[in-house]
């Protein structure tokens, strides 16, 4: 059995889980060693360069290796299901952890506004990136897996263009475009705080 044949369709779920676990482990190692992804990477004009690079490189790899089982795996349903489940666990599970849950109570006791309270947290939770999960390496790698899956699935259907594929193409390309633009635009988002006096 060769390495290429081990990616056969009957093993797609198994390889999908292995790939996502590998991405999570690499992401966690990077998160604890390097820290979070700098916000400047997704600010203008770097987001344009990143977006164009992703589209050109992934499209080039797809066209060069479109008949390989690994490309079929990355653009297939098993990989999509695994990556969506893991992304859902990351966003709902880790995103619902509130590190500031005691701040309002402590602020009420001291008679100050919650935003004026000092934040003391477990340094490991901060290093894990729970204050801003979208800037963590492990989230970025899993999200990149979802973008690659949607892009490869769209390209696969676009090759054999038929009228019945139009809804599939619009649906998958639209979802890919929303996710892609949302991530690349997050570096330029500004959060402003306005205090109103009565």
Residues covered by each model-derived region:
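Solvent-exposed, non-transmembrane regions of integral membrane proteins
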Residues: 1-198
């Amino acid at each position: 059995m060769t390495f290429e044949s081990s990616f056969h369709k009957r093993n797609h779920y198994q390889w999908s889980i292995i790939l996502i676990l590998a991405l999570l482990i690499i992401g966690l190692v990077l998160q604890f060693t390097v820290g979070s992804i700098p916000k400047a990477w997704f600010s203008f004009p770097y987001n344009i360069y990143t977006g164009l690079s992703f589209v050109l490189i992934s499209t080039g790899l797809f066209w060069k290796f479109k008949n390989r089982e690994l490309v079929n795996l990355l653009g297939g349903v098993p990989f999509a299901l695994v990556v969506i489940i893991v992304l859902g666990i990351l966003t709902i599970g880790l995103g619902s952890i509130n590190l500031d849950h005691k701040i309002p109570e402590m602020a009420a006791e001291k008679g100050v506004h919650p935003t004026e309270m000092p934040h003391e947290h477990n340094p490991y939770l901060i290093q894990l990136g729970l204050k801003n999960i979208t800037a963590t390496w492990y989230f970025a790698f899993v999200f990149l897996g979802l973008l690659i899956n949607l892009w490869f699935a769209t390209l696969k259907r676009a090759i054999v263009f038929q009228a019945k594929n139009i809804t599939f193409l619009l649906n998958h390309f639209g979802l890919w475009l929303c996710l892609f633009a949302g991530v690349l635009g997050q570096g330029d988002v500004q959060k402003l705080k306005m205090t109103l006096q009565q």
